[in-house]
C-alpha cells in the first residue's frame, strides 16, 4: 500500500512538474511573443515623429463648374494601392499612410491630402490623373526653402483661444469584409451632407475630418471568402440553411472583396466657444456617416486619453495596434472625394480659374515675368529682347496686380541699364520706382513732374527739325483736340477747325522757338501774322492768310478763330500748363533720352494736376516720343538702342499715333508696354491696332464683357470663366518665342515683397528728385517773364 501511495504521489509530482514546466514555457513564450511584438512596434514606429514632420500637406482645389464624377475618386484610391510594400522585411516596416482631410472654418471649407514627402510626386500625379483640373498647392512643404521655392501658406488651425474641444474616432462596427452603402446606391452625392454640416461653423468654431488610409494585406479577403463559402455551404444543406444573407448582400460582399482594401481610421475634432456647441457639431458629423449604413456601419469609439488622441490628430499618426477597419477604394470614394458642380454648399474653396503649364520652349533668360506653377512644378518665365520688340498689352481690373507687374519689369530694366520712359497718371508708380533707383543711375533720371510749380520743366510741342516732323506735330495736336473735345467725331472738331489749326501751327513753326502761345497769338493778332508771313516759305500756307482769311468777313473770321482759341485757351490760361508748354526750348531731348538710355519718369498724377491737365500733357508727350523714335531713321539699325516705353492707363493718351507706334516703332527700337482696365476704354482703331500687332498679352482679372472678347485670344486653354475669376497677382499670358506664337499659359506674378522693400532708399529718391529738378527745371520767375515777353501779355 505504501509503495502504491508513493507511486501515485510520484506520478502526481511528475505531472505537476511537467505542467509547471509547460506553463513556464508557455508564459516564457508569451512573454517572448509580447516582447517580440513590442520590439516590432518599436521598430516600426520609432521614427514616426520625424516621418510625420517630413510629410507635405497639399491643398487640393477644383473649379466650381467641374463635372468630374465620383468614379474618379475611386480610380484615385485604387491607384494609391501601389504604395503597398511587399519586401522581405515588410513585417518590420509600417506601410506608408496618407491622410485625406476636410476642414470647415467660418465661411471656408477646404480639402487637403497629407502625404510623406518621398511619395509627393507620385500622389500629385495620381490626383491630377483622376482630377485633371485640380490645382495642388503645398501648404507646409519642409523642402520648399531648400529648393529656393515659396511656401504657399501655413497649415490650417481649427482651434481658438478659450475654445472647447470635442473629438471622436470611428471605424467599422462589423467585420472588415462587410460593405457599407456606397455612392452608387445613394440618390445624392454623400459629400453634400458632409459639407453642409461643416458649412455651419460660426465665428470661433472649426472642425476637421481626418481619414487616414494605409494599403492593407489580403488577409481580410481570405476571411471574407471563407465567410461566403460557409454561407453558401450552409444554404446548400437544408438542415443547416439559415438564410442570414440574401443573394444581393452576398453580391455586395463579393464586390467589396474584388476591390483594393485600405486599413482606415477616421478622426473628427471640433472646436467651439462652448462645450455644448462642440458636442452638437460632433454629433451632427457623426450623424452624417449614418447615410453609409448597410451590412456594416461606422461606430464611434471611445478615447479615454485626450492628450494621446490630440497628439495623434495633430501629428496624423496612424494607429499602432488597433483602431482600423478595411475600406475599399469604392467605399473611400463614397466618403471622400473632391466636389463638383452638383455640390452647392456655400463656403467651399473653389479654384477660381484653371492653370496651364507654360510651353517648354519659352526663354530661360531675359526679362523675368513671373512663375508658371502647374501640378506642383514651378518654373521661372522670361521673355527675350527680340520678342519684347513686338510690344506688350496688359489688361485687368483695378487692384488685380497690373501696376505691380509693370513696376517689376521697369525696375529690372533700370537695373539692367536700359533706357526707360514711364507715364503714370496716378503718381504712385513713379514714386515707387524712385525709391529703388540705384545710385549709379541717379544721373540718368529725368523726373517730369508738372506739379513742381517752383521749377517747371519746359516742353515745347512745336519743336520740329524737319518738314515731316512739323506736319506730324500739327496732326498730333489735331488728334489731341479730337480726343479731348470730339471723341465720337460728331462735328465739334471738324474740317474747318483742322484746317485753321494746321495752318496756324505750320505758320508759327517757321519762327524757331515758337510755342502754343504763338499759335494763340497768330489766331488772334493780325499784326503778328504780318510779321511771320515773310518767313513762311510754303506758298499754300502763305495764301491761306493772304487769300482765304483776308477775304473772310470779320464776323465769320472771329466766329471760327474764337471757337478755336476757346479750345486752346483753357490750357494756355492755366499757369501751370502755360509755364510748361510756353517755354521756347524743351528741357530735354526725347531723341537723346532714347539714344543715351536715360530714365524718363513722367508723373501725371490726376490728384495733383487734375484729370484734364493730365490727359492733355499725356496726349502731347506720346507723339513727341514717337517723333523722336522715327528720327532714328538717320542711324543704322544696329546702332539703335532699345528703349522701353511704359504707359499705365494708356487709353487716356491713346490717339491714332498709338496705332502707328504699334505698327512701326519696332524697327526704331521703341518697345511699348501699355496697361489699362477694360477694352471699352479704347477706340475701335486703337483696339484693332492692339490686338493686331501686340506680341504679348497679359490678362489679369477682367469683367464679363472683356472676358467674352479676350476668350478668343486665349482659346482653347482658357475660357470666359477663367478670365473673370483669375486670382489677384495672377494672369493669363499669350506671348511669342522667337517671333512665333505659343499656347497661352497661367502666370503667377507675386514677388518677394521683403526683398523689394530692402531695395528701397528714400534718401536716394529725394536726392534724385532734387538733382532732376535742378538740372532740367527752370526758376518759375524767369519762365513767366519769358512767356510774358513773347506773348505780349
Predicted feature locations:
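Conserved nucleotide-binding/hydrolysis micro-motifs of P-loop NTPases
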Residues: 65-67, 120, 143, 216-218, ...
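Short hydrophobic alpha-helical runs that function as membrane-insertion/retention elements
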Residues: 134-138, 393, 419-423, 444-448, ...
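C-terminal anchoring/interaction modules
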Residues: 741-744, 753-793
Amino acid at each position: 500500500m505504501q509503495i502504491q501511495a508513493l507511486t501515485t504521489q510520484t506520478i502526481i509530482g511528475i505531472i505537476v512538474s511537467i505542467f509547471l514546466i509547460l506553463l513556464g514555457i508557455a508564459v516564457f513564450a508569451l512573454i517572448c511573443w509580447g516582447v517580440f511584438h513590442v520590439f516590432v512596434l518599436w521598430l516600426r514606429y520609432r521614427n514616426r515623429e520625424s516621418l510625420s514632420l517630413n510629410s507635405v500637406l497639399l491643398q487640393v482645389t477644383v473649379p466650381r463648374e467641374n463635372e468630374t464624377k465620383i468614379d474618379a475618386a475611386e480610380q484615385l484610391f485604387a491607384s494609391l494601392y501601389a504604395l503597398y510594400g511587399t519586401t522581405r522585411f515588410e513585417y518590420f516596416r509600417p506601410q506608408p499612410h496618407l491622410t485625406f482631410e476636410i476642414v470647415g472654418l467660418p465661411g471656408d471649407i477646404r480639402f487637403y491630402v497629407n502625404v510623406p514627402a518621398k511619395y509627393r510626386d507620385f500622389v500629385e500625379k495620381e490626383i491630377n490623373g483622376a482630377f485633371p483640373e485640380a490645382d495642388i498647392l503645398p501648404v507646409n512643404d519642409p523642402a520648399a526653402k531648400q529648393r529656393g521655392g515659396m511656401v504657399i501658406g501655413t497649415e490650417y488651425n481649427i482651434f481658438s483661444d478659450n475654445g472647447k474641444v470635442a473629438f471622436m474616432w470611428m471605424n467599422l462596427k462589423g467585420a472588415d469584409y462587410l460593405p457599407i452603402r456606397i455612392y452608387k446606391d445613394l440618390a445624392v452625392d454623400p459629400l453634400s451632407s458632409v459639407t453642409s454640416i461643416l458649412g455651419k461653423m460660426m465665428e470661433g468654431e472649426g472642425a476637421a475630418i481626418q481619414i487616414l488610409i494605409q494599403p492593407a494585406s489580403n488577409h481580410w479577403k481570405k476571411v471574407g471568402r471563407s465567410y461566403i463559402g460557409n454561407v453558401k455551404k450552409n444554404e446548400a444543406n437544408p438542415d443547416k440553411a439559415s438564410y442570414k444573407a440574401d443573394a444581393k448582400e452576398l453580391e455586395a460582399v463579393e464586390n467589396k472583396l474584388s476591390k483594393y482594401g485600405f486599413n482606415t481610421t477616421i478622426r473628427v475634432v471640433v472646436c467651439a466657444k462652448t462645450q455644448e456647441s462642440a458636442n452638437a457639431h460632433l454629433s451632427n458629423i457623426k450623424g452624417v456617416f449614418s447615410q453609409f449604413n448597410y451590412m456594416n456601419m461606422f461606430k464611434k469609439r471611445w478615447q479615454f486619453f485626450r492628450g494621446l488622441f490630440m497628439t495623434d490628430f495633430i501629428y496624423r499618426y496612424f494607429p499602432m495596434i488597433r483602431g482600423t477597419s478595411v475600406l475599399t477604394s469604392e467605399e473611400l470614394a463614397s466618403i471622400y472625394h473632391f466636389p463638383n458642380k452638383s455640390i452647392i454648399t456655400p463656403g467651399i474653396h473653389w479654384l477660381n480659374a484653371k492653370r496651364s503649364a507654360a510651353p517648354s520652349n519659352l526663354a530661360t533668360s531675359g526679362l523675368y515675368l513671373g512663375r508658371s506653377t502647374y501640378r506642383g512644378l514651378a518654373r521661372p518665365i522670361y521673355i527675350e529682347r527680340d520678342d519684347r520688340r513686338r510690344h506688350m498689352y496688359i489688361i485687368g481690373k483695378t487692384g488685380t496686380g497690373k501696376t505691380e507687374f509693370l513696376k517689376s519689369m521697369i525696375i529690372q530694366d533700370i537695373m539692367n541699364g536700359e533706357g526707360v520712359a514711364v507715364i503714370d497718371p496716378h503718381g504712385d508708380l513713379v514714386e515707387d520706382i524712385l525709391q529703388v533707383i540705384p545710385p549709379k543711375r541717379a544721373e540718368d533720371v529725368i523726373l517730369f513732374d508738372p506739379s513742381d510749380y517752383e521749377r517747371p520743366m519746359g516742353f515745347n510741342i512745336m519743336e520740329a527739325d524737319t518738314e515731316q516732323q512739323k506736319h506730324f506735330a500739327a496732326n498730333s495736336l489735331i488728334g489731341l483736340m479730337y480726343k479731348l473735345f470730339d471723341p465720337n467725331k460728331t462735328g465739334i472738331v471738324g474740317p474747318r477747325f483742322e484746317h485753321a489749326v494746321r495752318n496756324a501751327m505750320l505758320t508759327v513753326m517757321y519762327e524757331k522757338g515758337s510755342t502754343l502761345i504763338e499759335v494763340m497769338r497768330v489766331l488772334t493778332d493780325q499784326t503778328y501774322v504780318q510779321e511771320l508771313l515773310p518767313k513762311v516759305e510754303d506758298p499754300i500756307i502763305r495764301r491761306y492768310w493772304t487769300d482765304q482769311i483776308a477775304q473772310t468777313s470779320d464776323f465769320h473770321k472771329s466766329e471760327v478763330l474764337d471757337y478755336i482759341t476757346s479750345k486752346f485757351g483753357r490750357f494756355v490760361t492755366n499757369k501751370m500748363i502755360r509755364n510748361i508748354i510756353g517755354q521756347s526750348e524743351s528741357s530735354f531731348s526725347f531723341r537723346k533720352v532714347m539714344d543715351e538710355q536715360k530714365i524718363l519718369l513722367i508723373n501725371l498724377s490726376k490728384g495733383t494736376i487734375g484729370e484734364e491737365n493730365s490727359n492733355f500733357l499725356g496726349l502731347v508727350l506720346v507723339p513727341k516720343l514717337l517723333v523722336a523714335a522715327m528720327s532714328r531713321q538717320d542711324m543704322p539699325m544696329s546702332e539703335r538702342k532699345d528703349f522701353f516705353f511704359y504707359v499705365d492707363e494708356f487709353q487716356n493718351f491713346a490717339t491714332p499715333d498709338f496705332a502707328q507706334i504699334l505698327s512701326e516703332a519696332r524697327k526704331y527700337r521703341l518697345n511699348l508696354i501699355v496697361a489699362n482696365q477694360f477694352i471699352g476704354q479704347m477706340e475701335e482703331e486703337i483696339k484693332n491696332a492692339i490686338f493686331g500687332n501686340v506680341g504679348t498679352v497679359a490678362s489679369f482679372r477682367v469683367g464679363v464683357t472683356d472676358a467674352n472678347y479676350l476668350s478668343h485670344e486665349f482659346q482653347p486653354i482658357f475660357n470666359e470663366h477663367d478670365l473673370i475669376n483669375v486670382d489677384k497677382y495672377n494672369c493669363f499670358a499669350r506671348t511669342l518665342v522667337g517671333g512665333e506664337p505659343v499656347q497661352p499659359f497661367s502666370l503667377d506674378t507675386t514677388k518677394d515683397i521683403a526683398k523689394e522693400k530692402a531695395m528701397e532708399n528714400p534718401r536716394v529718391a529725394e536726392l534724385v528728385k532734387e538733382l532732376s529738378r535742378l538740372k532740367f527745371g527752370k526758376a518759375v520767375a524767369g519762365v513767366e517773364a519769358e512767356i510774358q515777353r513773347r506773348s505780349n501779355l
